[in-house]
Amino acid sequence: MNKTPTTLIIMDGFGMTNGQSGNAVFAANTPRLDRFFEEFANTTLSASGLDVGLPDGQMGNSEVGHTNIGGGRVVFQDLPRITRAIEDGSFFQNPSYLRAMDNCLKNGSALHLMGLLSDGGVHSHITHVFALLELAKQKGLQKVYIHCFLDGRDVSPTSGAGFVAQLAEKCRELGVGKIATVMGRYYAMDRDKRWDRVEQAYDAMVYGDSEITNPDPVDAVKKSYEKGVTDEFVVPVVCDANGTVSENDSVIFFNFRPDRAREITRALVDQEFNGFTREFFPLTYICNTEYDASMPNVEVAFPRVLVNNGLGEYLSSMGMTQLRIAETEKYAHVTFFFNGGSETVFPGEDRVLVPSPKVATYDLQPEMSAPEVCSQCVERIESGAYDVIILNFANCDMVGHTGVFDAAVKAVETVDACVGRVVEATLKMGGIAMITADHGNA
């Protein structure tokens, strides 16, 4: 007997605002969504700050939105959790941090701090690396190197030079720490197995091998701007040839969001890694949070706090079937993050991963893989196999991040067309469709 599905459609990055300037959602032609808003009950939701477990005034993001939707409650996030630990002093007694630093003292080896250098608060926060430098000073470490991944997505695309300058000043103030490399997150924080990018980041940090060397990291970033290359895309630059990651060193990756921290981490710690050719050597490696339960040879400074009885777990406990479907860029969001940061696949839960297109930036293909996600979702709705279907359309967020307005408009229009098809298929099966977003970006 066919099931009547409830379909939860998450339009990633689809934001509602009264402002018209730079508003791709307003500018787009969206006849299907317009009709739904006119004919069916709807409201707006806050997806930032305290309403989703972030600090007051902190913008939302995909991870946080999916965690709260899947949890069915306000789930306090890693950013305020780590910040509170700094404020109450427990950060400076964290056993994993202390083991990393004690390893350096024991072996006369170096401590490497690496991560996204910005105050965006989505993947990391600059105050956290400042606190790690303070702890390194307290422990009397001499060899401390920082590998800076520049942002340009969650903050201004030319704010990186300022953040690097702040870090350099903090190192001078504390008398500890040297900036070893700077590079755009495009290279160091890939999440789609574009190993050619990750390899360039790895080579700079491990071998000191890069196209550009510059002992002045701020100048290196500014020179990149002069070439029209902004923070996200700054090619890896080696600033201190002595700051390479070597055997028996300690590494603390201060990103707290897992999805873009996994690939470079696995390249550094997993003996079975085969994304590109590199040598394996032992490290004391600290992940700020749990990036992947299967990640070998790492410790976790802030283990995850489980969200019990979230939507997926509850549906499973009721004997209901559920489908999670998204393209690569948002697959982790409808699975790992939606399940409260758990890798668990619940009984009755099926998953479909549609590959994201292999393009340099998504403004070049603003439809991304939404048509294929849509087609596969419709096929499974019509199969009558699922009680609940949870899907994500990535376009508004991923194309919005490029800052290319016309492409963002096309992304919104693509989502409008796909949502229309999914809603139509759901209603034909006698089901219910719910349309929402995780946060606003387009």
Outline where the language-model segments fall.
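Structural motif
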Residues: L8, H112-M114, I252-F253, V388-N392, ...
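Metal-dependent active-site segment of extracytoplasmic phospho-/sulfohydrolases and closely related
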Residues: A408-A442
